[in-house]
Amino acid sequence: MKDLLKFLKAQHKTEEFDAIKIGLASPDMIRSWSFGEVKKPETINYRTFKPERDGLFCARIFGPVKDYECLCGKYKRLKHRGVICEKCGVEVTQTKVRRERMGHIELASPVAHIWFLKSLPSRIGLLMDMPLRDIERVLYFESYVVIEPGMTNLERSQLLSEEQYLDALEEWGDEFDAKMGAEAVKALLGNMDLNAEIDLMREELEETNSETKRKKLTKRLKLVEAFLLSGNNPEWMILSVLPVLPPDLRPLVPLDGGRFATSDLNDLYRRVINRNNRLKRLLDLAAPDIIVRNEKRMLQESVDALLDNGRRGRAITGSNKRPLKSLADMIKGKQGRFRQNLLGKRVDYSGRSVITVGPYLRLHQCGLPKKMALELFKPFIYGKLEARGLATTIKAAKKMVEREEAVVWDILDEVIREHPVMLNRAPTLHRLGIQAFEPVLIEGKAIQLHPLVCAAYNADFDGDQMAVHVPLTLEAQLEARALMMSTNNILSPASGDPIIVPSQDVVLGLYYMTREKINAKGEGMYLAGPAEAEKAYLTKNAVLHARVKVRITQYAYDEQGNLSSETGLIDTTVGRAILWQIVPKGLPYSLVNTEALGKKQISTLLNTCYRKLGMKETVVFADQIMYTGFAYAALSGVSVGIDDMLIPKEKYTKIAEAEAEVAEIQEQFQSGLVTAGERYNKVIDIWATANEQVAKAMMDNLSVETVINRDGEEEQQKSFNSVYMMADSGARGSAAQIRQLAGMRGLMAKPDGSIIETPITANFREGLNVLQYFISTHGARKGLADTALKTANSGYLTRRLVDVAQDVVITADDCGTHAGITMTPLIEGGDVKEQLGDRVLGRVVADDVLKPGTDEVLAPRNTLLDEKWCDLLEDNSVDQVKVRSVVTCENDFGCCKFCYGRDLARGHLINTGEAVGVVAAQSIGEPGTQLTMRTFHIGGAASRAAAENNIQVKSTGSMRLHNAKFVTNSESKLVITSRASVMTVIDEFGRTKESYKLPYGSILSKGDGDSVVQGDTVANWDPHTMPIITEVAGRVQFVDFIDGVTVSRQTDELTGLSSIVILDAAERTSAGKDMRPTVKLVDDKGNDVMIPGTDMPAQYFLPGKAIVQLEDSALVGIGDILSRIPQESGGTRDITGGLPRVADLFEARKPKEPAILAEITGAVSFGKETKGKRRLIITPSEGQPYEEMIHKWRQLNVFEGEKVECGDVIADGPEAPHDILRLRGVHAVAEYIVNEVQEVYRLQGVKINDKHIETIIRQMLRKVTIVKAGDSEFLPGEQVEFSRVNIANRKLEADGKDIVTFSRDLLGITKASLATESFISAASFQETTRVLTEAAVSGKRDPLRGLKENVIVGRLIPAGTGFSYHQRRQNQRNAELEPVAPQVDAEQASQDLAALLNAGLSDD
């Protein structure tokens, strides 16, 4: 019997599917799902609690209410399985069929499906080529629509009002056919010939010229083709049969007191059934048309509400005024099916409790309370008790555990040994938020956590809680141990730096231990080794800080991995020698023997240990460091008292000086010498400087102390002040915080980011007065409000990033591409922000790296650059390397190993199946909460170092100018006349050391290739105005300068000099609106002077607000300034910072006023102007000129006649990433986004590897727009996956046909997530209704490639350990598809062989 059952069950196995397809259901299909028609709106009999027959809970249709028992009770027990009771008609089977059996309702009149009607763009409307308004009027019985015009002059699908219809009836009788309601729409859809429509549209597409029409046609064509290809029938968008959800999925639960709690769906279904039955009765009675019509309309509305309540008209509400939850609401949103039940499930075998410190634990351990362990490991304990024969049955074992007998604890110890548990702290922002530990049983009720993993969990012990999960199966335990054990996660996946780094107490202890003190007890001793040093310390013959000589043995590994040692006397301190005892062999003593061992140095120590000696040593070392640190922190006795905050004596004089300066500025302002804005800025500058000076004085005062040395002389040494030591070691606090404690609090910001000009001169030691306290609260409250917003925004960013990147998995070893991105060191101004070595570390070289100036290959192609290679590049002064990148990987799905490079968390080449997309998303999203929300205003002490007005080089070398145009002025200095010029300083090896932007009009004292010495000032400019510089010499001639109309004269009161100011267009009278004030240059005869190398006259148009300080017909030389444009407006543009900036970059949002870039290479000219815009024309040397209209208020960087390259900046502003992609290509846009995102994170001191950002960029670039379709089935203008085009092109090329040409698109992460191939993934992200509607119409097939889809359908994900499972299935499937070779048994084979041989012999 059992085997029979097994056989029956096997038929329904749904494991073996490779894809999920979604489509429209035909009425027949709905009937085939159904187990019977629901005819009555009744649910259950409230007296007997039995379901009503033919009602919404009918047992005959949906199955029995009790297991193996029919409704009337005639058949009970298993033996009657499968019998259908003749009395009540119920099949005797399990109740759970009530979760899967569906019913149906035969609708008396067809009804349109609201999703295909109202979800924009309306599918029904697009298909019928009618406006949505018109279709609605037909469906809701307001108008007639012509279905068959016959011989009349009406047209098909023409709308007729009631009167028009009656007139037509009178005129033509029944020659034509017109109807209303869903029947009419159904008839129209049924009459469509899709093939004919397609041919018609393709013809129209050939002929049409208008862009809008072409777009509309393409949309409609794609829809019609989708219907044809998917085998969906357009009529199926109109429902004539409505499926009914199985009753256990819309339960009715009796509450005590005779009331019922019910799912909203039951109410909605009841309304549909009531109206449907009433309509049937009305039709039978042949009621008047108007009544029937009203009933049909009501039926349509009730079905609309059932499918998607609130989409049309007001939402139907229940008894408590709350809108009812329809079928659509069930699946969408955070509480919907996708996100609540399919992507996030609850787990059994878990517990949670408060965490506390376990400083004596080893790194791989955690303390688990006995109570919790007993509960969590129950099944294992029961099993063990039974296996030992201590309990006869599970029930007996249960009893023993409940009584907590002595033997149970012994068994628990055994069970727990070597059985890892997983600890998780919410919010889990990156993969280190869940790690595995070996449990150690402890008393008490709190989980004990190892202090070093706190950084990864972002945990502290102020009441945080953590959850424990038990991996049950052997595979799960193995994975937890091999992959998730805390000892295997020493490096952060975001940056590749150690994340198991001591902080706070431990750092302070080690720092204190390794400091030196002058003339301490025991100074000058000679010690035989670390052990003797420790002895000396313990016997109080020497203190920790005493400077002594110790005999130290250092070990080092050579290339072959052999240990060699050398011993020598080293000047050091007692503390450092003691610390050396725990340092593993193979590290140099210099790492310990430093001025002070702060947090950075300890991090370096651990990193070096990991790279040189491997994981095991590092783990042991980290634990030892922690124990030592804690011990010596306790011995140090560092604590904070109010006297430790030393206030510098100079503070009060500095403040008095600043106050005097402010008073002076105030006087100047009152006498009208400075404007309000200037006064404000100057006051803030004064206070910012004063604050800096007080802070400096305070730190100088705190950081050194004077002591008497052995010779009795005074000497300076680093201070042992507690506050200073905490900050200096990196344990807690920073210079900025000490400044508030003992310096002055300084300037405070208002919530809008502007700075209050009254500073807080007091510090926390002195205490604030009421006014100062009030000013402080202003910004502080903003900070708290920001934090709450930030957390939500950051979480949403992470969610979008994960969604867009989830299907990037390492799928292949090498895609073989030669493409890549060129890496150079990041230089801003005079300092190197990031060395080349740091940027290319862990990358794979795309082309051979040559030694500069030779043909010698330093690093061959496909080398993984590790630390040693990077040092080699550094030694040979290589200044650019082309490395492979995720962005340029040519794999169709996922990415290859070489393009990704090193697995940052493990330190070797990445493995296949690694889910690099999700790791990238987590790495970018996790620090999100640390980023600021604020938009920075320039003009605050925060960001205003005095405006730059010159360049002073910081290193010696030679100077280079890049894409610079310049003229030489009368003083034979160079004046820059180009916009995007860059000046770099190069050392003798040709490496770029510094890089500066040169603004237009800067005056250089050195030329290209000249040598410069450190400290030289090589360029100056005026930061507050933008000059207009003449490129020719001649006499000035003013054009359109009319006093009071286009210009006004102003005389400076102080200097008596007069200047001419051009009026803004808004200030001019109507007469001056069309005039363009221009400065022309003429020679002595009055003829125009030409710009050298062109036939353009030299004339300079002046924008509004420009100031001219020349008189008409003055003589000017080359490079002289004709006019200045004040740069006030430009300076106060808000710079969006922090989190919003990162979100903007990844969403690829166009900035408000983007930079205007040249679309083609050519010469600039201006054409006819309109009211608010001017016409920019770029004429190439050959081909069509390009025109663009630009707002007049945009300041242009080009003058008439200038030559521009494609992608040059014409008007300044933030660059739009789409423009960069279009004009400069994929590499440029990738570099732009990477640098901009890194800029934000670098400001916050967060380190993220470029790889992660590139992974996201790859996903943003995965769509292309078809330009020419070639011989493919794509349409021009269609947006397609990059991979699909590549696959199609390879096939076309192989067949020798025309390939597709396309342009790459940049999509924001939200758009990109919704545009994935997988509709399941897109639907579970956002806009569920729209995604599913679109997918259903085009009959989409989801190949289940990404991680999310597989989680939703309940499979292993195709990454990590699940990767091999999916590959195995794939291979199995391919094997099934291949023709099977005929099987031959051994005897047959030997006979065949003999026959062949005989044949061969008999031939002779």
From Swiss-Prot:
Work out whether the entry's keyword set contains Zinc.
yes
Query: Which residues take part in binding Zn(2+) 2?
Result: 815, 889, 896, 899
Catalysed reaction(s)? Answer: RNA(n) + a ribonucleoside 5'-triphosphate = RNA(n+1) + diphosphate
A GO molecular function annotation here is:
DNA binding
Q: Which UniProt keywords apply?
A: DNA-directed RNA polymerase, Magnesium, Metal-binding, Nucleotidyltransferase, Transcription, Transferase, Zinc
Where is Zn(2+) 1 annotated to bind? Answer: 70, 72, 85, 88
Cysteine pairings via disulfide bonds: none
EC number(s) recorded for this UniProt protein: 2.7.7.6
Q: Which GO terms describe its cellular component?
A: DNA-directed RNA polymerase complex
One Pfam family assigned to this protein is RNA_pol_Rpb1_3
Q: Which residues bind Mg(2+)?
A: 460, 462, 464
GO biological-process terms attached to the record:
DNA-templated transcription
Q: Which cofactor does it need?
A: Mg(2+); Zn(2+)
Q: How is the cofactor bound?
A: Binds 1 Mg(2+) ion per subunit. Binds 2 Zn(2+) ions per subunit.
UniProt entry tagged with the keyword Transcription: yes
Q: Which InterPro entries match?
A: DNA-dir_RpoC_beta_prime, DNA-dir_RpoC_beta_prime_bact, RNA_pol_asu, RNA_pol_N, RNA_pol_Rpb1_1, RNA_pol_Rpb1_3, RNA_pol_Rpb1_3_sf, RNA_pol_Rpb1_4
UniProt record similarity statement: Belongs to the RNA polymerase beta' chain family.
**Assembly and oligomerization:** The RNAP catalytic core consists of 2 alpha, 1 beta, 1 beta' and 1 omega subunit. When a sigma factor is associated with the core the holoenzyme is formed, which can initiate transcription.
Q: In UniProt terms, what function does this protein have?
A: DNA-dependent RNA polymerase catalyzes the transcription of DNA into RNA using the four ribonucleoside triphosphates as substrates.
What this protein is called in its record is DNA-directed RNA polymerase subunit beta'
